[in-house]
Amino acid sequence: MVVRIRLSRFGCKNRPFFRVMAADSRSPRDGKHLEVLGYFNPLPGQDGGKRMGLKFDRIKYWLSVGAQPSDPVQRLLFRSGLLPPPPMVAMGRKGGARDTRPVDPMTGRYVDAENKTVNANDNQPKEEDTEAKSA
């Protein structure tokens, strides 16, 4: 049994409200769960922000016993400071070859094998370099 930490949808039509749940990966989205770990309201409140409440000690427990967060929950846990940022991959042009080098989410730069950051636009030759080579 693989335990996943995921969102379960509640609320009316066009007014979603989510609970953060620890549930078996085979159970349906809104089905049987093991524990409620928090809530997330994506609609802006009176202050204009989204509301989120999490039980950090229980989330840390479930992560320590091997529970896997879903992608939306991983982004929520990153925003709350509980997990490191999820890995991002730079995408090339539409229809062209994809660049699969990892990207640092804080700076938006490529990360080399030696953990050095390289500017994302440095992989393209500059106009001055191409003119010097042709001359």
UniProtKB/Swiss-Prot annotation:
Keywords: Chloroplast, Mitochondrion, Plastid, Ribonucleoprotein, Ribosomal protein, Transit peptide. GO terms for biological process: translation. Residues 124-135 have a biased composition (Basic and acidic residues). Residues 87-135 are annotated as: Disordered. Pfam families: Ribosomal_S16. It is found in: Mitochondrion; Plastid, Chloroplast. This is the only bS16 protein that is targeted to mitochondria. Belongs to the bacterial ribosomal protein bS16 family. NCBIfam families: S16. Component of the mitochondrial ribosome small subunit. This is Small ribosomal subunit protein bS16m/bS16c.
